[in-house]
Amino acid sequence: RKGNILLACLDESFVYNRKSCLFHQLFGLWTKEWIYLGSTISGQEEIYIFIDEVQLIEEWEKSVNSYSQDYTEEYELFISGSSSRMLSGELATLLSGRYVQFPVYPFSYQEYTEIRHLEQNRESYMGYMNTGGIPELFVLPEKQEVQRNYLSALKDTILLKDIIQRYSIRDPRLLEDLFAFLVGNASNLVSIGNIVNYFKSQGRKTGYDAVAAYIGYIEDSFLAYRCERFDLRGKEILSGTAKYYINDLAFKNFLYPGTAYGVGYKLENLVYLELLRAGYDVYTGCAKEKEVDFIAWKGDRTIYLQSTYMLVYEQTVRREYASLEAIQDNYEKLVVSLDDFCLPSHEGIRHVRAWELHGLL
C-alpha cells in the first residue's frame, strides 16, 4: 500500500544535502510513526524504498552495501541511476550475489499499443516508429512544438547532469554534435577514425582520444548503444567498426528530423532495442563477406536476424535471405519487415512482421 513505499528522487533541485548521511536520514523516515501523507507503518509489513539517481550520494556504494546486510529490518531496497557504470567496480564487488539488475528502457511497442488502446498491426507500428517511447510524450499535448521542446530539455539535462558535470567535459559543443552524429548515423557501420575525419572535414579540430571518450560517456548515460561486429567464421569480435543505435527514436523524430535516416534504418534500431528488452546479447555480424544485421544470444538460444523495410522486390528478397543462407548452422534465422503479408519459410529462414517479433523472442 502507498504508506509502505518511500520514493526519493535525488536529482530534484530541493535536495541540497548529498553527503553519505543522507542515506541514513532517508531510512530514518520510515522508522518513525509517520511517513509521507501521514500514513503509518505496521511493524509486520514490508517496506519498499526506492532511491532514484543514487549515484549522486557520496560513497553511496558503501551505504547500499551496509543496508543490504541489515537483516533485522523488513524492507526491499530499489536503487536506480542513469549510468551504466553503476554496477561496475566497487559496488559489484561489495554486493556480489546479493542484487538483481533490471535494465529500464523507454516504452516498447507493446506498451505503446496498450497505453494508446491500439491493435497491433502495421499502422500502429508505424505510429510507434514515428513517435517513440519516451514516457512523458504520452501525457504531453500532442503538439510537435511542445514535444520537441520537452525532448530538447531532456537531452540537454542528460548531457549536462549525466555527462558534462560528472566528467568535467571541456568541449560541450563537441559532445552534443557527437550525439547528433550518432542519431543521424544510427544503424550504420562507423569507426572512431571515420568520425574524427568527418569532423575535421567540417573544420572542427578534435582528436581520436576525445571523440572516443565522449562517445563512451554517451553510451554510459544510455543515450546510445554500441553494437560490436562479430566474425562468424573466426568466432571473434572485430575491432574498429561498430554500429550505434539510439535509446529511443523520439530523439531522431523530433530533434534531428533532417538527417538522412530512412524507415529501414528506423526499423533496424527498433529491432535492436526489442532484442535488448528480451535480454539478448546482441552483435552485428559478417559471414563470407555478407553482413548480418544481428546475432542474438540468450542462454543456449542463438538467433540470426535481418531487418528490411519491405520485401516487395525480388532483388530485396534475394539480398536479405542470401546473408542468412551463407550461415552454415541450424540456429534460428529470421527476416523482419514491415510487409502486411508473410512470406513462406525458405531454407529454414522465417519471415516475421515487425509487430509480431516480440512474441517470438
Task: Give residue spans per PLM region.
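Active-site ExK catalytic segment of metal-dependent nucleases
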Residues: 302-312
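Structural recognition of the conserved hydrophobic beta-strand(s) that form the central parallel beta-sheet
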Residues: 50, 76-82, 103
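Conserved catalytic/switch belt of AAA+ P-loop NTPases
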Residues: 61-79
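Domain-level recognition of nuclease-like catalytic cores that cleave nucleotide substrates
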Residues: 340-361
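Conserved P-loop NTPase "ATPase switch" module shared by AAA+ and STAND
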Residues: 42-60
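Short glycine-rich substrate-engagement loop in P-loop NTPases that contacts/grips substrate
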Residues: 8-45
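Accessory nucleic acid-recognition modules appended to NTPase machines
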Residues: 144-302
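Interdomain motor-coupling "hinge/lid" segment immediately C-terminal to the ATP-binding subdomain
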Residues: 82-84, 88-189
